[in-house]
Amino acid sequence: MRILPLSSDSMGARSMATFVETKDLRIMIDPGVALGPSRYGLPPHPKEWERMEAHWREIVRQAHKADLLIVTHYHYDHHNPWEGLEIYEGKRVLVKDPKRNINQSQRGRASFFLKQIEGIANVEIADGRSFREGDTIIEFSEPVFHGTNSKLGYVIEVFIREGEDSFLFTSDVEGPSLDDQARFVLEKKPKVVMVDGPMTYMLGYRYSRASLDASIRNLSSILDAVETLVIDHHLLRDLEWSKRIESVLNKGREVKKKVITSNELVDKPLEMLEAKRKELYELYPVDESEMREWKFED
């Protein structure tokens, strides 16, 4: 099994887009990428725009090779309903249920996206289901909260197994801070798990200390069940990310388990462009007329 992160916050843009290849299938999970609308009162720096656009080109390139595409929920850093829709043409597309366990915002986005690919893709609801192709098994969790409650909607987690190899993609659980989000990981015991991590860049605002503490407990439990913990996305928007989960990193070293970020999985440098936005504007000044806003919330 080959696991290839194509875009991530550790690589400079908001995304968890991941390409997984087995002997039987080439799978594209969450083909989307976005930018943080505002950090430190600043819009995305031109270098962030450049990175996002480069990542999107790579996502499209790899998605063309895919036999199967998966959309775990309908935030714009996980799917793109406007561009590159040809990647879905003639493909099997497994999606989060657009009508059940979904909030109003995602319901509208899901409807729009599915109309965009209607007639060109073979769309199936994935929630709680299992699929098999040869020796490759794909299992989906029941919907779990995007975060600590239903305000941001629900996501589905993805487990892929091929023989002795296995990979689990939590999508946006923001931790996981809830037991039912962690349960799917603990039950499946994947060799490699990719987690979006606690949303510590909003600690004390939209993410509580109690949620962080619960996430650390769950991540520690997950370490007992896996060989490699890949943590990225929400956590990697915080320059202090490693301090926030120091106990998890320490445990990983103690029990000889890998705790890494997505960039390390593909031997790329850590480039937290959004978290370093203020620094980017200081190092590479931009005239106000050249600033571009990202107008969409995730």
From Swiss-Prot:
Q: Which SUPFAM superfamilies match?
A: Metallo-hydrolase/oxidoreductase
Citing just one GO molecular function, the answer is: hydrolase activity
Gene3D superfamilies (UniProt xref): Ribonuclease Z/Hydroxyacylglutathione hydrolase-like
Q: Which domain of life is it from?
A: Archaea
UniProt record similarity statement: Belongs to the UPF0282 family.
Q: What is this protein called?
A: UPF0282 protein Kcr_0286
* Source organism per UniProt: Korarchaeum cryptofilum (strain OPF8)
